[in-house]
Amino acid sequence: MFAVIRTGGKQYRVSPDTVLKVEKLDAEAGATVTFTDVLAVGGESGTTIGAPLVAGATVTATVIAQDRLDTVIIFKKRRRQNSRRKNGHRQPVTVLRIAAINAA
């Protein structure tokens, strides 16, 4: 069984026991998160595609950790000006393990 969920402005195809990194959610490690923005649900009996959401479908996940991605370097230089700027950014993410998919 699989589902397509929407969180943080992105869409993810998930199935039970899938571990994925999503944009930061306000939840502690060990907490349970429920996603109601389910765009599609599929399995052996067929696939249901929402317009835009599948009514009554939910995906439950457990928060494993709050983490940060690798550093992205931003380097700006103006030629012949002896002007340069180096900056770094680490995007915060939440690591989830999908527990259950409930198709209504």
Curated annotation (Swiss-Prot):
Role according to the record: This protein binds to 23S rRNA in the presence of protein L20.
One cellular component term from this protein's GO annotations in UniProt: ribonucleoprotein complex
Domain of life (superkingdom): Bacteria
Subunit structure: Part of the 50S ribosomal subunit. Contacts protein L20.
Classification via Pfam families: Ribosomal_L21p
Gene Ontology MF term list: rRNA binding; structural constituent of ribosome
One biological process term in Gene Ontology: translation
Membership in a protein family: Belongs to the bacterial ribosomal protein bL21 family.
Signal peptide as annotated in the record: none
Gene this chain is encoded by: rplU
Record key words, sorted: Ribonucleoprotein, Ribosomal protein, RNA-binding, rRNA-binding
Matches recorded under InterPro entries: bL21-like, bL21-like_sf, Ribosomal_bL21
Protein name per UniProt: Large ribosomal subunit protein bL21
SUPFAM superfamilies the record matches: L21p-like
